[in-house]
Amino acid sequence: MSEHNVYGAAQPAQPAQPAQPRTRIRTHHLQKMKAEGHKWAMLTAYDYSTARIFDEAGIPVLLVGDSAANVVYGYDTTVPVSIDELIPLVRGVVRGAPHALVVADLPFGSYEAGPAAALAAATRFMKEGGAHAVKLEGGERVAEQIAHLTAAGIPVMAHIGFTPQSVNSLGGFRVQGRGDAAEQTIADAIAVAEAGAFSVVMEMVPAGLATQITGKLTIPTIGIGAGPNCDGQVLVWQDMAGMSSGKSARFVKRFADIGGELRRAATQYAHEVAAGVFPADEHCF
């Protein structure tokens, strides 16, 4: 079978090239991407169906975030969500994403007490949830926990800058690392890298500071409200796809209106059922 070029002339059909099999993304793949200057995207996921779609789209890292507290369970902050509420979500995401690296958030209260508590929490996510790595919030103050987890063979993604679990002590949703506070943010980044974290999320950090930190670290940086020069970017998928209600954060770009489409579909479905239009003959046995 022939194909046509842009001018309409037939071209000989080319033999199909075998597709390169995709393999599971591992932490060393992210390190290689940083070394080669390749930027990559990370999204949150909380269930099998969306994880499957994102995996098919080639998203290399999926985060089962404690943001599930807000978008799955309806809490006002991430503070109330528990390990028992998150582990079933991790299981679904791992099943739906055969290629992505699946990272599980350690929720508030599960690791602050020290290395032993962090190891107990992380072990549950790895054994019961099937996660490939865990994420925890904090810089220098959690370096000991990070070192303990990595020594136990558990890959750790760190999270500095604005840390949502600390929203009460930070005085609300505020940019971190401005002015004199920049030195502490840099110190936090260096501390988590030296403790063995394989990557670090920087949230709501001035773009210039994030660029500086990205250049200092050998591990990948992942930005959310931290400018364009991080090695990766992450968004909550409901924000990215237009499922969230209310005003979006400044760092969010909506790439679709899934919420509007779903609302229209549900409205049309209800209308057709009420009108006796659905199910039609073609939907019957």
UniProtKB/Swiss-Prot annotation:
GO terms for cellular component: cytoplasm. Belongs to the PanB family. Binds 1 Mg(2+) ion per subunit. It is an enzyme of class 2 (transferase). This is 3-methyl-2-oxobutanoate hydroxymethyltransferase. GO terms for molecular function: 3-methyl-2-oxobutanoate hydroxymethyltransferase activity; magnesium ion binding. Its cofactor is Mg(2+). Disulfide bonds: none annotated. Catalyzes the reversible reaction in which hydroxymethyl group from 5,10-methylenetetrahydrofolate is transferred onto alpha-ketoisovalerate to form ketopantoate. The keyword Magnesium applies.
